[in-house]
Amino acid sequence: MNTQLNEIWQKTLGLLKNELTEISFNTWIKTIDPLSLTGNTINLAVPAEFNKGILESRYQTLIKNAIKQVTFKEYEIAFIVPSQENLNKLTKQTESAGNEDSPLSVLNPKYTFDTFVIGNSNRFAHAAALAVAEAPGKAYNPLFIYGGVGLGKTHLMHAIGHYILEQNSSQKVLYVSSEKFTNELINAIKDNRNEEFRSKYRNIDVLLIDDIQFIAGKERTEEEFFHTFNALYEANKQIILSSDKPPKEISLEDRLRSRFEWGLIADMQAPDLETRIAILRKKAQLENLTVPNEVIVFIADKIASNIRELEGALNRVIAYSSLTENEITVELASEALKDILSANKAKVLNCTTIQEAVARYFDIRPEEFKSKKRTRDIAFPRQIAMYLCRELTEMSLPKIGEEFGGRDHTTVIHACEKISEEIESNSETRRAVSEIKRNLLGK
């Protein structure tokens, strides 16, 4: 974001604060971040689609008028929810408008190390990201971050970009999604601009590519990225990649997969209750919102899936409070989230549904759990299924044993103890159990 735009926005906020009630200003206006100026349009980042809808229908004219008072000029404004797709569109518009700045893609101003909440589920990934940001090209190269949807991978990617530029603004940092990389390559081939494409991606200091798993199966993209990777790596330039799965589970050429494993691999898990509470407190603090502690604990306890849905639930509660002009209480939060909570309750968990979910994850048949087979490809998933039956249902140990081919309750105890130990010591097991639980709970 440029300095001029920031000054305009700060003055605009001053005007809007005098026009609106405190709760309306804090709920809707203070959550906006100025992103960029494209032609005659000011692009404003908002936290969710719900906010975007309210702002467009109720506050757009007010904001435009305030900006006009500050600048003495008529500007259009665009509210953007900073998903990768929208950021890609914005980057493309900015480039077409003749922006000759460094090749940095639009970074979400909210995604910094300062706003990242550290917990057991992401501590290692955060430490690795910070180490890379402090010494790009020298610490871990490449850094490969993986984990499920909405767990903070993109936040860390943006945070690395921000940190590097804060330390040295002359660094050429390029952040893109794998989809954008692929689309630019296709256009370069079509328009005979291959050298221009290669120059863009190989004459930089730091390359961050989100969702790298999507290049799998795209032969030309894999080939081009292989050579891009080599060029940057040999020049000691930093490469950071993110994915929803570890390199060995992505269907890539062996030579590319092995390169992804050259540096450091860090996984991110679903946040535990304490981290979820800390995330909600941080969000409320950053947006200057007063949310009672019991409401934060209530939301954190009910929404255990991922950070994106967790923050979305808080936004929903705050919006509901603002629109109904009622105080934020546990009762109000329960009412605001009733469709989400009832959907979660509707999920019936029993041994059969757990066995099916585990079997689906490991690509085996549920009947195998009741067989006498003891090979690891069957025994290990069976132990995970037993562990989840024990954790997620009220079934007794003997009853669980019956559901697994009439096995003794001591076998179930052994399975639960083994998987508990594996979760503590093995990130692959931890990730598998976490993902299966998310699938089961619909989170």
Swiss-Prot record:
Segments for region (Domain IV, binds dsDNA): 322-443
Chain intervals for the UniProt region annotation (Domain II): 75-105
For this protein, the record's InterPro entries field holds: AAA+_ATPase (IPR003593), Chromosome_initiator_DnaA (IPR001957), Chromosome_initiator_DnaA-like (IPR020591), Chromosome_initiator_DnaA_CS (IPR018312), DnaA_C (IPR013159), DnaA_dom (IPR013317), DnaA_N_dom (IPR024633), DnaA_N_sf (IPR038454)
Residue ranges of region Domain I, interacts with DnaA modulators?
Answer: 1-75
Output the SUPFAM superfamilies linked to this UniProt entry.
P-loop containing nucleoside triphosphate hydrolases, TrpR-like
Q: Where in the cell is it found?
A: Cytoplasm
Q: Which Gene Ontology terms of cellular component type are present?
A: cytoplasm; plasma membrane
List the Pfam families.
Answer: Bac_DnaA, Bac_DnaA_C, DnaA_N
Function field: Plays an essential role in the initiation and regulation of chromosomal replication. ATP-DnaA binds to the origin of replication (oriC) to initiate formation of the DNA replication initiation complex once per cell cycle. Binds the DnaA box (a 9 base pair repeat at the origin) and separates the double-stranded (ds)DNA. Forms a right-handed helical filament on oriC DNA; dsDNA binds to the exterior of the filament while single-stranded (ss)DNA is stabiized in the filament's interior.
- Annotated protein name in UniProt: Chromosomal replication initiator protein DnaA
* The species this protein was found in: Acetivibrio thermocellus (strain ATCC 27405 / DSM 1237 / JCM 9322 / NBRC 103400 / NCIMB 10682 / NRRL B-4536 / VPI 7372)
